[in-house]
Amino acid sequence: MRVLLAGGGTAGHTSPLLATADALRRLEPDVEITCLGTPRGLENKVVPEAGYPLELIPPVPLPRRPGADLLKVPFRLRAAVRATHAVLDRVRPDVVVGYGGYVSMPAYVATRKRGIPLVVHEQNTVPGLANRAGARFAQRVAVSFPDTPLRNAEYVGLPIRPMISGLDRAARRAEARAFFGLDPDRPTLLVTGGSQGARRLNQAVSAAAGALAATGVQVLHAQGKHGGADPQPGAEETGVPYVVVEYIDRMDLAYAAADLVICRAGANSVTEAAAVGLPAVFVPLPIGNGEQERNARPVIDAGGGILVKDADLTTDWVVGTVPPLVADAERLAAMGAAAAALIPRDADERLARIVLELGLGSSAR
């Protein structure tokens, strides 16, 4: 059986794609898996590192507003569909799985023309344009949140890797803090804006470095490719670690090291933090169609997280809120338990079984 997984751009698409790929391999070791992406996405790094072949097609950005870029979409789409047909000729998949993003629309169009079974997985509460289109003719549609408005949607959850879903944070804490060069005993704040980073978030938190250090709070800060994390001069003289990295490959250890995370509210960030029982301050991206705030809302309503609007995340807010929160072990434990109770940890295998059911039926014909 052969499977083509189409998705990429950011970790929001690549992480569930790779989690599904790994689950397929566990359930059906002989399955042949190929990933489909574009030359500009994170998939060019993480897919080969995970050991899966990667095919590339031109990206087809879908503008949210009318303009010159919208006029270019038909031409870009035709070129990308042609490239996808060439990939389908080489791979000959029995089933295609799409995760949204710039690569998915041409994959959906070409797959439909070939009559290949299609599975669509939507990561956010508010579906993107490509997945809204693909869901109209997909054989199966899976969603990460129970109230996502897609036709014939099945709630399976967001696929995450077992290294995350099965993480025992307390058991791995000492190892994790040593891995990142952190003190083994200090309260620890994790800061991440996702694979793309979040410059304003980075600046607001890093400017509080001295005040956080004065209260004994150490920080692990993944600033992303756009940077912006610049701990104030003198913060290092306190002896309290403030570790800045561009990207964290071992998010399992980052979660294990942390007592609290400040992050955006992409589906991946929300699901992973909740799954490991890590209390979170969610700062939704202030653009798009509001999907990030909606992603975080179930965790917030359950008491597992705090919502702070991007404009309200100031250095003063960080200084006034974070130290007393990370010092309140009872509140953190309650938040973590509330978040963890919401998340299905077997979504990777749930989605993989849907894919296998369709693909094995197709290959038998």
From Swiss-Prot:
Gene3D superfamilies: Glycogen Phosphorylase B. This is UDP-N-acetylglucosamine--N-acetylmuramyl-(pentapeptide) pyrophosphoryl-undecaprenol N-acetylglucosamine transferase. UDP-N-acetyl-alpha-D-glucosamine binds at T10, A11, G12, N124, R161, S195, I248, Q292. Its main location: membrane. NCBIfam families: murG. Cell wall formation. Catalyzes the transfer of a GlcNAc subunit on undecaprenyl-pyrophosphoryl-MurNAc-pentapeptide (lipid intermediate I) to form undecaprenyl-pyrophosphoryl-MurNAc-(pentapeptide)GlcNAc (lipid intermediate II). CDD domains: GT28_MurG. Coiled coil: none annotated. GO terms for biological process: carbohydrate metabolic process; cell division; cell wall organization; lipid glycosylation; peptidoglycan biosynthetic process; regulation of cell shape. It catalyses: di-trans,octa-cis-undecaprenyl diphospho-N-acetyl-alpha-D-muramoyl-L-alanyl-D-glutamyl-meso-2,6-diaminopimeloyl-D-alanyl-D-alanine + UDP-N-acetyl-alpha-D-glucosamine = di-trans,octa-cis-undecaprenyl diphospho-[N-acetyl-alpha-D-glucosaminyl-(1->4)]-N-acetyl-alpha-D-muramoyl-L-alanyl-D-glutamyl-meso-2,6-diaminopimeloyl-D-alanyl-D-alanine + UDP + H(+). Pathway: Cell wall biogenesis; peptidoglycan biosynthesis. Keywords: Cell cycle, Cell division, Cell membrane, Cell shape, Cell wall biogenesis/degradation, Glycosyltransferase, Membrane, Peptidoglycan synthesis, Transferase. Belongs to the glycosyltransferase 28 family. MurG subfamily. It is a peripheral membrane protein. It is found in: Cell membrane. InterPro entries: GlcNAc_MurG (IPR006009), Glyco_trans_28_C (IPR007235), GlycoTrans_28_N (IPR004276). It comes from the Bacteria. Transmembrane segments: none annotated. It is an enzyme of class 2 (transferase). GO terms for cellular component: plasma membrane. Its EC number is 2.4.1.227. The keyword Cell division applies. It holds the Pfam family Glyco_tran_28_C. One of its GO terms (molecular function) is undecaprenyldiphospho-muramoylpentapeptide beta-N-acetylglucosaminyltransferase activity.
